[in-house]
Amino acid sequence: MSLFALCYMFAAYLLGSISSAVIVCRLAGLPDPRRHGSHNPGATNVLRIGGRWAALAVFVFDVLKGMIPVWCGYYLGLTQFELGMVALGACLGHIFPIFFKFRGGKGVATAFGAIAPIGWGVMATMLGTWVLVFVISGYSSLSAVISALLVPLYVWWFRPEFTFPVALVCCLLVYRHHDNIQRLWRGQEDRIWGKKSNKK
């Protein structure tokens, strides 16, 4: 990677470190998502504690945190590998934000935004997988994990030159969901709708 690409990746990390969930909840007078609900500063938890409009604002901002640096990097002439590292930097910022004591979200929306510029085919299949699993199961976490496992295959099919960096991002997402995977295995994960289970 060039020195410019490394600096740009760090800038993407700083942008990703802006926790929209915390900021939106503060502006809207809602509880801190890091201390309420699932304790995850992400759109799904904000939906639980603050409603759909607050969650939508968080989701859009988180998507843009990943999409903007990758789009700009593309027009700045970064290589495919460097663009992948920029996407990874944005996701790392969301998950481990330097501005919020490294307590961040799961990175799903930011990863979606970072991967979407690769192409319409990748974006459509990625979104379609998440929606299908979510509609069938009601589990946001399960939708994210299955999507993360399948997205590298979609990328390999449509844009194989991006497969390795996208796989790194998806591995990070699966790792970040390890607690959710354990709760799903034990039948203790909460659905977005329907009867909620106790996570203790």
UniProtKB/Swiss-Prot annotation:
It comes from the Bacteria. Pathway: Lipid metabolism; phospholipid metabolism. One of its GO terms (biological process) is phospholipid biosynthetic process. Keywords: Cell inner membrane, Cell membrane, Lipid biosynthesis, Lipid metabolism, Membrane, Phospholipid biosynthesis, Phospholipid metabolism, Transferase, Transmembrane, Transmembrane helix. It is found in: Cell inner membrane. Its EC number is 2.3.1.275. The chain crosses the membrane at residues 4-24, 53-73, 80-100, 115-135, 138-158. GO terms for molecular function: acyl-phosphate glycerol-3-phosphate acyltransferase activity. One of its GO terms (cellular component) is plasma membrane. It catalyses: an acyl phosphate + sn-glycerol 3-phosphate = a 1-acyl-sn-glycero-3-phosphate + phosphate. It is a multi-pass membrane protein. Catalyzes the transfer of an acyl group from acyl-phosphate (acyl-PO(4)) to glycerol-3-phosphate (G3P) to form lysophosphatidic acid (LPA). This enzyme utilizes acyl-phosphate as fatty acyl donor, but not acyl-CoA or acyl-ACP. Probably interacts with PlsX. This is Glycerol-3-phosphate acyltransferase. It comes from Actinobacillus succinogenes (strain ATCC 55618 / DSM 22257 / CCUG 43843 / 130Z). The lineage of its organism: Bacteria, Pseudomonadati, Pseudomonadota, Gammaproteobacteria, Pasteurellales.
